């Protein structure tokens, strides 16, 4: 049986990596060995970035809720505790949306929280 060389597979693999490295500067987009390292690092950073994005958005929502709650005379922690006592289950993303886009609706929630705290 004839020996089968892996040239075609190697070429496909190299082209796949070089395609991912398109736009990188210098040897990073031209040479397979350097491009492979850069692509691996980029993919690792992209994976970490997708996890980081979730944390950053939660931080942003909390900051917005805190600012709006303080404008209505309540701290973030007391506001959230008041909502918990009132058995209002609205997630932080929606609370932040209310704080930014519907000040009156948010104020009503603050009043509900205040009444349960008192």
Swiss-Prot record:
Q: Which GO terms describe its molecular function?
A: rRNA binding; structural constituent of ribosome
Listed InterPro entries: Ribosomal_bL20 (IPR005813), RIBOSOMAL_L20_CS (IPR049946), Ribosomal_protein_bL20_C (IPR035566)
Give start-end of the signal peptide.
Answer: none
Which keywords has UniProt assigned to this entry?
Answer: Ribonucleoprotein, Ribosomal protein, RNA-binding, rRNA-binding
Q: Which HAMAP family match?
A: Ribosomal_bL20 (MF_00382)
Annotated function: Binds directly to 23S ribosomal RNA and is necessary for the in vitro assembly process of the 50S ribosomal subunit. It is not involved in the protein synthesizing functions of that subunit.
> Per its record, how is this protein called by name?
Large ribosomal subunit protein bL20
Q: Per the UniProt entry, what species is this protein from, by scientific name? A: Lachnoclostridium phytofermentans (strain ATCC 700394 / DSM 18823 / ISDg) (Clostridium phytofermentans)
Ranked from the top, the taxonomy reads: Bacteria, Bacillati, Bacillota, Clostridia, Lachnospirales
